[in-house]
Regions:
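Small cysteine-rich, disulfide-bonded extracellular modules of the LU/uPAR three-finger superfamily
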Residues: 1-97, 104-144
């Protein structure tokens, strides 16, 4: 089992089908759910499901994670790109090693898997997931 950082394969087709709207203010609600290192997440992940083994748990963490703030997609140099504002899990006690971004408005469809590169442990502290800056080479989500 592993957490493999990737854009989910199903998401690539769903974008072309118009199933995801990332527009600031009027788009779908996307959430960030945290997972422990033993979770099995990767390109074949198609949806968020509360029954999927490996979701983090702990004080002040709710299954399903937290809502993200969309940043409207842009395009430059042949690449479409978009991201989210940084996400803060407040005053949590938990351990995690990765996350799943998913569309909670539209069937909990998976968008991408994040691997934090290490196991993170927080005890009654904020956990901040910092997204890279918006740009054709840096954004967390890019299609070239």
């Amino acid at each position: 089992m592993a957490i493999v950082q990737t854009m989910c394969t199903s998401f690539k087709a769903e974008v072309a089908q118009g199933l995801h709207n990332f527009t600031t203010g009027t788009g779908n609600v996307f959430k960030l759910a945290l997972y422990v290192a033993t979770a099995n997440l990767g390109a074949d992940t198609t949806e968020y499901n509360v029954l999927t083994p490996g979701q983090a748990s702990g004080t002040n963490y709710t299954a399903g994670g937290i809502a993200l703030t969309n940043i409207t997609p842009l395009a430059a140099n042949g690449t479409g790109y978009w991201s989210f504002d940084d996400a803060t899990f407040s005053n949590v006690t938990l351990t995690c090693a990765g996350a799943l971004i998913y569309n909670s408005t539209n069937g909990n469809r998976a968008v991408c898997v994040l691997n934090f590169g290490q196991t993170i442990t927080k005890t009654a502290a904020n956990l901040v997931v910092t997204f890279p800056p918006m740009g054709a080479t840096d954004s967390v989500l890019r299609i070239a």
